């Protein structure tokens, strides 16, 4: 039986095709969408909304269907109403303290067929401003510093925002470090944004520290298509959103900053459940999946059961020993990121975090490989920072670095967490959104592990 945050929750029914709005936008991860066409559709679909979450109607038709290709699992089609999109946009605007005298302008640098890109268009419609669309979104060119700077030059309002994935921000900052002239332009352009939303994948501590050192207002986001985009910003739950953590059997031990299990009674650990007007209606034509993830309480409140484990901890008030009323959410990783090696539960996210703490490591990706002895062998791929790449051709130095990384994992997380396979890659293969391609990385690690 599934534990729930509210007793007596009932599974929600799956939305059917008949509930689609005549002008509903349907997108798929493997089929790039035309942002201009989507913008026109959103203008019609969201025309009756202001930046006001109170206008949500539960029975309204579906406005946006976000589909996956199924390359990493069974395809799903997440259905969102116009009201859910409006509720999410309102929460974002309120987070940045909406100013009636200063309109917001967005730069679209992510594909429109992903929820983060679609939300940039929805927020623009609700703000009443035209978004700037980067060339990399509509032309067969990659996101680059030059593409970014060209797009920023087209922005006309002072209150400006952008959504990026960590790989994109890393590319911009790395280019700035290697080219002083270009670097000044990049820093100035990034610094002109009121807010830089960073999501889609975990951002490393080094990347966030570099952004903070430059004075950039980077906000890490947590959310998905099921929540109409980000609903937790830099650990803070957005207005109108409710988050509960429900303990479950089989969760990995949660390390604190010293690498030891956390026992603080004020800290909650469990599967993340989310409620709010921004939730999706469910999965079109998929009753089983909808019933597994969406629930409705007796009072009509709907909940989304995520695939993620999290930690809610109180935040100390400035200059005080007392905690603030609003706790901070830390995402520990997906439930399917819990690997069992030799009978020990290990968090893939925790291993990646420890690897990325080493100054030579730029980013890490951790997976589990089938193994006759261990059941699952912990495997990790890492890329290196520029200063370490010059020595990467040395087999001896690579072996020494891998030994150090394994030792760090053993020290902080225990011997079972030390990767059995550790591969140093020049760069991670990327998906169309600029995220590390986990399926391709898995194939590389599996090949390396089998070759011994």
What are these regions (language model features)?
Residues 5-20, 92, 115-129:
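Hydrophobic alpha-helical segments in the ANL/AMP-binding
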Residues 251-295, 346:
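Conserved ATP/PPi-binding loop(s) of AMP-dependent carboxylate-activating enzymes
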Residues 300-302, 309-417:
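AMP-binding/adenylate-forming catalytic core of the ANL superfamily
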Residues 63-90, 97:
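Conserved AMP-binding A3 loop
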Residues 11, 47-67, 99-104:
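Conserved pre-ATP/AMP-binding loop-to-beta segment of ANL
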Residues 82-88, 105-171, 219:
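AMP-binding/adenylate-forming
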Residues 174-235:
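Gly/Ser/Thr-rich phosphate-binding loop
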Residues 339, 366-367, 379-381, 406-452:
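Conserved C-terminal "lid"/linker of ANL adenylate-forming enzymes
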């Amino acid at each position: 039986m599934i534990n729930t945050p509210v007793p007596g929750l009932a599974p929600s029914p799956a939305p059917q095709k008949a509930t689609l709005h005549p002008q509903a936008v349907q997108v798929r991860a493997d089929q790039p969408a035309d942002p201009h066409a989507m913008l026109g559709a959103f203008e019609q679909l969201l025309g009756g909304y202001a930046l006001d979450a109170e206008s949500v109607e539960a029975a309204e038709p579906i406005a946006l269907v976000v589909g996956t290709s199924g390359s990493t699992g069974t395809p799903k089609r997440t259905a969102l109403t116009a009201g859910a999109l409006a509720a999410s946009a309102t929460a974002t605007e309120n987070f940045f303290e909406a100013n009636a005298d200063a309109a917001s302008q967005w730069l679209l640098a992510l594909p429109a067929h992903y929820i983060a890109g679609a939300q940039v268009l929805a927020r623009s419609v609700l703000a009443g401003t035209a978004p700037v669309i980067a060339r990399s979104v509509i032309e067969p060119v990659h996101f680059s510093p030059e593409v970014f700077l060209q797009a920023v030059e087209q922005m006309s309002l002072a209150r400006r925002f952008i959504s990026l994935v960590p790989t994109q921000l890393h590319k911009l900052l790395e280019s700035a470090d290697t080219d002083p002239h270009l670097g000044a332009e990049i820093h100035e352009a990034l610094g002109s944004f009121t807010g830089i939303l960073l999501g889609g994948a975990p951002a490393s501590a080094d990347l966030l520290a570099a952004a903070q050192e430059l004075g950039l207002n980077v906000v890490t986001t947590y959310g998905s298509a099921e929540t109409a985009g980000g609903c937790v910003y830099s650990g803070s739950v957005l207005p109108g959103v409710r988050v509960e953590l429900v303990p479950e059997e089989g969760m990995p031990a949660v390390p604190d900053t010293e690498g030891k299990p956390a026992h603080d009674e004020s800290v909650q650990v469990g599967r993340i459940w989310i409620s709010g007007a921004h939730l999706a209606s469910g999965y079109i034509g998929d009753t089983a999946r909808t019933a597994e993830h969406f629930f409705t309480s007796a009072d009509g409140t709907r909940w989304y059961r995520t695939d993620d484990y999290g930690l809610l901890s109180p935040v100390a008030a400035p200059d005080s020993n007392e905690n603030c009323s609003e706790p901070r959410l830390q995402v520990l990783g997906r439930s399917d990121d819990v690997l069992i090696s030799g009978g020990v539960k290990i968090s893939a996210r925790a291993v990646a975090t420890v690897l990325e703490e080493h100054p030579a490591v730029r980013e890490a990706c951790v997976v589990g490989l089938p193994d006759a002895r261990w059941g699952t062998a912990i495997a990790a791929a890492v890329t290196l920072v520029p200063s370490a790449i010059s020595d990467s051709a040395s087999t001896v130095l690579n072996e020494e670095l891998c030994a150090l990384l394994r030792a760090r994992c053993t020290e902080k997380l225990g011997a079972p967490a030390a990767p059995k396979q550790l591969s140093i890659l020049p760069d991670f293969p990327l998906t169309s959104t600029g995220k590390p391609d986990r399926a391709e990385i898995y194939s590389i690690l599996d090949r390396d592990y089998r070759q011994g």
